[in-house]
Amino acid sequence: MKKWKWIPTKQIFQTNGQEKKKSRVAKLISDKIDFKRRAIKRNPESKVIILKGRIHQEDINIVNIYAPNIGAPKYIKKILEDFKKDIDSSTIIVGDFNTPLSKMDRSSKQNINKDIVSLNNTLEEMDFNDIYRAFHPKEAKYTFFSSVHGTFSKTDHMIGHKASLKKFKKIEIISSIISDHQGLKLETKPKGKNWKHSKL
């Protein structure tokens, strides 16, 4: 893996793929959010952004992942393992994982495979879990419809540290007109502001 480099940041953060400089991952921070930028990290494959900063005097790390269609669980697990030292209790991992994390995340209710189990084990070891599933353990709502398979799934996720769950008020799946995926909206308790994430 090539060495990553911290570089100055702006209010719009994106990675560019090699093909026609196509943007693969983008993170937009609203001007209404009191976000103080510190640094940004991009990986060579243009599928990950790690954004460091502060909101309302609290540190926050946003890890935005766009996983490949094939081998997504293994890819995400490798990212988490390679950059474990950069991930702490102030980190929120978001993005299109291109994989469900549980049986509830599939309309077919098909069991998850061993690679997803392994990814979940890694998250558990890091004390991270699916924020949406923590608030809605039995609710079957989805973020993506596959016209090829005729099935719905929740492949877009927000993952947070267990110690940070108390900071969040609610999380919901919302419609999006700029993507073929639905978005996720995370609302913090009164000290903070609303977070809204959707795949562009």
Question: What does each of the following model-derived ranges do?
Answer:
Residues 1-200:
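A shared catalytic/ligand-binding motif for oxyanion handling
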